[in-house]
Amino acid sequence: MHDVAIIGGGLAGLAAADALERAGRDWVLFEARPRLGGRILSQQVPDEPQGAARYDLGPAWLWPQNTRLLTLAERLGVRVFEQHAAGRLVFEDGGGALRRDLDFHPMAGALRLEGGMRALVDGLAAGLPQAKVNLGKPISRIAFEDGAYT
């Protein structure tokens, strides 16, 4: 029996596992999917070194005021850079009409991570004992029986 069961291997679950591991606590993580990351999903760019070039299919940006993610990125050695925001915005509406006269930059000030958001997932996962990480294990029931959770 473990002290803590973490349900979900997204960024929050991995951060919890990381904090518990660094504090010397006993924990176990269950993730229903066969991969870690939750909504963070990055696709490897073909013909590039593994992890060097990815594009994000889930969250892609973070902001300067998100100090927790920036601190985590620094601790994991993940390079942070500014989102390119120069140039003009091209917008395609639902009917397929293009507008090129828009002169605003919705992502100005946004930050990106080298290797995509997946770099945070990989960095956290690398520091965890893999025997405590259970992939492809959906949890369908939690019960308190005989003084313990099962």
Regions found by a protein language model. Give the residues of each.
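FAD-dinucleotide binding site
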Residues: 1-150
